[in-house]
């Protein structure tokens, strides 16, 4: 997979990378059916995001839409932005260092988020691949993924996520119970790296049959 880690100056280049990212995740079974959504910050502060209800392994440029910081379409489009656009907008508002966001629905993330919903978090520790996360320098550190209740009140969920991130930095991602993983990075390249690292650790935890 080829990504450039760009400054996201143009829609055309970002759309191409989001299409490639979507296909990358779909091929690994992380976005079954039409699940998942992906976005990146554009140079003017608006966001390019995948349209709602589209299979992520077969996206075209028309399946990428542009929204403003509040999640509203910036121009006429036959496509609708993802129903979870507000969750993407929350992350970009939370930190100017976030340049791309990914939401996947892998088997491991779905199962473990259900298993750990009552505890409220999934703890991943002792995995060497954790050092792929930006700022992580040792495998002995613990990666804490909060688990939020799956709700259709996306605005309220975004508020809950923002409060957790403010109270417990650094946060590398979070889970929605029975739903999947949200993670992010400074650009698409780092976001891909974070997806792979976290999904790998979740796979390992699932195979191990439990979490401490």
UniProtKB/Swiss-Prot annotation:
What GO biological process terms does the UniProt entry carry, in alphabetical order? L-methionine salvage from methylthioadenosine; pentose catabolic process
Residue ranges the record marks as coiled coil: none
Question: Pfam families recorded for this chain?
Answer: Aldolase_II
- Positions annotated to bind Zn(2+): 103, 105
Pathway noted in the entry: Amino-acid biosynthesis; L-methionine biosynthesis via salvage pathway; L-methionine from S-methyl-5-thio-alpha-D-ribose 1-phosphate: step 2/6
> Which metal ions or organic cofactors does this protein require, according to UniProt?
Zn(2+)
Q: What does this protein's record comment on cofactor binding?
A: Binds 1 zinc ion per subunit.
Q: What is its EC class?
A: lyase
Q: Per its record, what are the GO molecular function terms?
A: aldehyde-lyase activity; methylthioribulose 1-phosphate dehydratase activity; zinc ion binding
Catalytic function, reaction form? 5-(methylsulfanyl)-D-ribulose 1-phosphate = 5-methylsulfanyl-2,3-dioxopentyl phosphate + H2O
Species the sequence originates in: Sorangium cellulosum (strain So ce56)
Q: Which InterPro entries match?
A: Aldolase_class_II_sugar_metab (IPR050197), Aldolase_II/adducin_N (IPR001303), Aldolase_II/adducin_N_sf (IPR036409), MethylthioRu-1-P_deHdtase_MtnB (IPR017714)
Keywords, comma-separated and alphabetical: Amino-acid biosynthesis, Lyase, Metal-binding, Methionine biosynthesis, Zinc
One Gene Ontology term, aspect cellular component: cytosol
Q: What is its EC number?
A: 4.2.1.109
UniProt similarity note: Belongs to the aldolase class II family. MtnB subfamily.
What the protein does comes down to: Catalyzes the dehydration of methylthioribulose-1-phosphate (MTRu-1-P) into 2,3-diketo-5-methylthiopentyl-1-phosphate (DK-MTP-1-P).
Against HAMAP family, the record matches this protein to: Salvage_MtnB
Q: What is the protein name for this chain?
A: Methylthioribulose-1-phosphate dehydratase
């Amino acid at each position: 997979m080829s990504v450039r880690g760009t400054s996201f100056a143009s829609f055309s280049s970002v759309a191409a990378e989001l299409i490639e990212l979507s296909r990358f995740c779909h091929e690994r079974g992380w976005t079954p059916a039409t699940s998942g959504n992906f976005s990146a910050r554009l140079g003017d502060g608006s966001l390019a995001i995948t349209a709602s209800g589209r299979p992520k392994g077969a996206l075209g440029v028309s399946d990428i839409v542009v929204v403003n910081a509040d999640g509203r379409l910036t121009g006429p489009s036959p496509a609708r932005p993802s129903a979870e656009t507000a969750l993407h907008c929350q992350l970009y508002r939370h930190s100017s260092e976030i340049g791309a966001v990914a939401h996947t629905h892998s088997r491991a993330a779905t199962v473990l988020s259900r298993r750990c919903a009552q505890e409220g978090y999934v703890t991943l520790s002792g995995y060497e691949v954790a050092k792929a996360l930006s700022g992580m320098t040792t495998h002995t550190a613990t990666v804490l993924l909060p688990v939020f209740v799956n709700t259709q009140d996306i605005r309220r969920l975004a508020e809950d996520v923002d409060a957790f991130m403010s109270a417990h930095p650094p946060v590398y991602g979070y889970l929605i119970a029975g739903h999947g993983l949200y993670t992010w990075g400074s650009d698409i390249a780092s976001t891909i790296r974070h997806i792979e690292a976290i999904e790998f650790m979740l796979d390992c935890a699932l195979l191990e049959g439990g979490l401490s």
